[in-house]
């Protein structure tokens, strides 16, 4: 026990020393801008990231003057173009433009980029930055340039009086920005250190980017507030006076913004938000989680009848990131007026708060000229930037140390075995001690930045204590290895949460000091009256139905077979369809129950997000309309992959249009593959070779397997549940004969594929059940096959490994001609028309509209805006898929794999196919039964059920 106290005391002293060395000035209501960036801590994670780059060049001074860069070279795909009377260079896929600059002496510069873009796409513009032909640090490989967006027209209401989300439009305007990390771990633009002499700077970008000039900028110092006031006095500017002098701008009335995700939202929790209504939806505030990433900005137009110096008060709320202050840069007419308006801190506020910018009880004054002024609020990490950078490095170090430990102990160590970790990893004690000290220091810095000890600082302190325990006694590590892995996840989640800077704004007001601000939350009796009205309104609200119109011949009913968020988006978008076609649409959210509704005569007209196995089952009972009989069918199906209609075809009729199409991809950790000198496997034999290397180091490979359930057997189909369809197709087999009357699981191809599939688990010990997200993040599973939808989950939930993983083509089977067959099945959802629909022509028009490119792009964009990257739409519309937020490199590999996708037919009774194959698999893997016997047994059972089903339906 005494030894433990000594260790903790030493670590606490070290953390205090580190804190003194690296903690920025405590954040007050008016943090001052500083040029210094904290570089004093030892970097122990990646050696090629921006943090390490800053450390190496910490003593390099800022440049004395700016430099213009001269264009010297461009790739052949780049063309000259004029936009708004300015010349630029239009990029196509993977284009480069190179500039030359002469540097007088060694210094660091910020890179200013002038750019515009075409309007054919709505994605942010990815680019890479190279200096002298090399990427200077990891973050420079994956950067983004933002577009400019605005609301398209004034807010409109639906038939019930609810405000609708305004359509977002992309504006084609030139911008000049400084290169920075879009992930938001740094506040300031990148520092590019250049030696004296000639250098080249290359921008590598993709489709739609229009590049203007590059400028190497110097570090610009903002004046202090006192210096600004002195300048105002010199200009003769006067403070406005009078209790009735104020200019209020509602937060929802934006001018322009950086992201289409930022749109008005509704708050009915407070009577004082304006405008408000206890019954209908009023989109009366803006921000929150949709305005949380560093670099996101919103601008407003403020009309000032009188020029002068105004106070600025913002009515805001920050109740999403508990206990955390957030920061914003505030621009007046394109400029941050003084250092105090950079990284302006908005303290944690669970309730709406009137926040007057100022210090020591005195407000700040800023100048507005007569007429229109542009006010911009930009999200920034503020004082958290250095902490985020350091904790990001610590997460990388924890991951690295964990992987090194499991190479010795495995992921399930024997707690009674002495692994001699201090001999196998000589610096392990020092590494854990340093981790503990740095985590404790980060916890203290965070508490200082927020002004209080929040749960976020407590999390870091708890992890620091465990690291101290391991440093004190390495024999505690095997027993605590699971806790260590959990700590890595905790720190990674901490990073993901703390980089968010959510802020909601109801309105902001420029005013004279004498102006009396209204209450942020209303009076007691106002709140009581509003709450009572809200309570009684709940009795008349139907939260499942979004019915806007009376039922009739010109009205169709659409069911959305997913969530309420998706249904709300469909409903809002359907109003545009009604405007265009004059057909009314009522939308309901319903999960399941379609067969029952059909039998009861209460079926809808159209169903969105119908599960893969449902259309053929319903069509076999004459419940669906044959879409191939409608005009324009061939043109509509041209939007999809060639065989996308196969799962929805029955007896020469087609009974659904595909909405989504998902298939398997291979995911791998590029950093671990580089460390271990591994190549991405192209075939299954190569995958087994990689697996052998990983398993020798106590890592593993993940292959998809989902235990069958009753609903899964009926709904999900067989295409991408597990690896068997992939292997079967690659081995030259098929599930069914050409007449679709029997299975072909008695073929040699089917048996060989089945043996290969089961042997992954019986001979090579691949895990059947695992948490892919967690294991991939920690590096335990650096290679895995998963649905392409996993891309969005990793992008949203694993920021600490950003840039350290990629998608690749599926492993394949070599062919006699030397090619590799990477065939695989697919899954997805569809849109169907019920045969009971009275106005089938109207339903067909709706289905055509909903599956067309622009509608799918709008739907996918709104979905991702609302729910994040994890909800990215895998649209079956090929053009729409290309216009969603994928990079060119990602699209290239996704398109390449899609060309190998072979859709598998769905049959009445097909649920027995997946169930029986799964039973055979489990018998072999769990009970060590013979593969041939079990597969033949499954084949006979399936064929009997298919025959029984045909007789029943005939």
What are these model-derived regions, one by one?
Residues 23-515, 826:
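Extracytoplasmic
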Residues 105, 306, 798-871, 899-903, ...:
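Extracytoplasmic/periplasmic substrate-recognition and gating elements
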Residues 650-659, 664, 688-742, 749-750, ...:
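Extracytoplasmic/periplasmic solute-binding protein
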Residues 739-769:
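Glycine-centered hinge/linker elements that transmit conformational signals in sensory
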Residues 573-643, 647, 671-682, 782-783, ...:
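Extracytoplasmic "Venus flytrap"/periplasmic binding protein-like
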Residues 810-812, 861-919, 923, 951:
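Long, aromatic- and glycine/proline-rich binding clefts that accommodate carbohydrate-like moieties
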Residues 551-563, 583-588, 606, 655, ...:
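Short, well-ordered beta-strand elements
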Residues 539, 543-548, 612-665, 688, ...:
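Hinge/lid segment of periplasmic solute-binding proteins
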